[in-house]
């Protein structure tokens, strides 16, 4: 199986302008125009992936990073963006400032973006299935696994799952083809582990995101923990770096608990780690 991180595609030179226009749009109508530009690019991405994988499972995580990560910080690029969008430079700068976050890892990212801007995940789901339809017509068997990130409350997953399935089914219906697909979630928040029995009722699979789960369980920032983890290991506080070796007592126990809870209500749920 291959695991695909969609956000990487968004940073590519041919699409970052449309991504930025989409993020900085003030209305849903403007966002949809930008998303229409991105749709054929995303379809092409997935066609290539499906063709290379030749029928093997492909797990695709929908957009996860905070939106501000895609925005420019240098004046020259901001001015070019303002010109292309026909907006005052100061207005663009204000919008960029408004999108900045003090703690982005715990902020407006993952499924939270889909709750506030559902059209983004709609576009991505449509791109995945249109690509699947295209390669199916070419004789390549595909069964995409669509993964919704950062779920901590079952109602988040239920809301977005319904959105994704509706988008997918409408697209399939237009083509009159049968495409096998599944919709699941990444388990990376401790609360998701503790309520896995609820979440599993709305998921075809779980993928445990051990990096973020480790960060949120220990309360360590992966980017900053290097400043003290060496001392922790030297002094015997920790035996190993928890970002290199899975912590079995804490993080592992949460995964074990989530596995047990999920299997009790959904015996056929597929479980994995990424």
Question: Which residues does each PLM region occupy?
Answer:
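Conserved alpha/beta-domain cores
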Residues: 1-274
């Amino acid at each position: 199986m291959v695991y695909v991180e969609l956000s990487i595609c968004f940073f590519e030179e041919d699409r970052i302008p449309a991504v930025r226009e989409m993020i900085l749009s003030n209305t849903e109508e403007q966002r949809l125009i930008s998303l229409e530009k991105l749709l054929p690019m995303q379809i092409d991405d997935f066609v290539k992936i499906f063709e290379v994988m030749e029928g093997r499972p492909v797990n695709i995580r929908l957009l996860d990073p905070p939106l501000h990560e895609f925005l420019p910080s240098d004046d020259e690029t901001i001015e070019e963006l303002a010109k292309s969008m026909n907006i005052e430079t100061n207005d663009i700068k204000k919008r960029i400032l408004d999108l900045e976050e003090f703690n982005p890892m715990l902020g407006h990212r993952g499924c939270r973006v889909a709750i506030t801007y559902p059209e983004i995940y709609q576009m991505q789901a449509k791109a995945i299935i249109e690509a699947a339809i295209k390669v199916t017509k070419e004789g390549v068997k595909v069964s995409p696994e669509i993964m919704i990130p950062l779920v901590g409350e079952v109602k988040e997953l239920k809301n977005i799952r319904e959105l994704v399935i509706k988008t997918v089914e409408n697209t399939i219906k237009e083509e009159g083809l049968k495409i096998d697909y599944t919709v699941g979630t990444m388990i990376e928040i401790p609360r998701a582990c503790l309520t896995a029995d609820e979440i599993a009722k709305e998921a075809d699979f779980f993928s445990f995101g051990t990096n973020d789960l480790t960060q949120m369980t220990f309360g360590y920032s992966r980017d900053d923990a290097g400043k003290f983890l060496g001392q922790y290991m030297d002094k015997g506080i920790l035996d190993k770096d928890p970002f290199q070796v899975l912590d079995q007592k804490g993080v592992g126990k949460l995964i074990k608990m989530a596995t047990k809870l999920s299997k009790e209500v959904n015996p056929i749920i597929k479980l994995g780690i990424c």
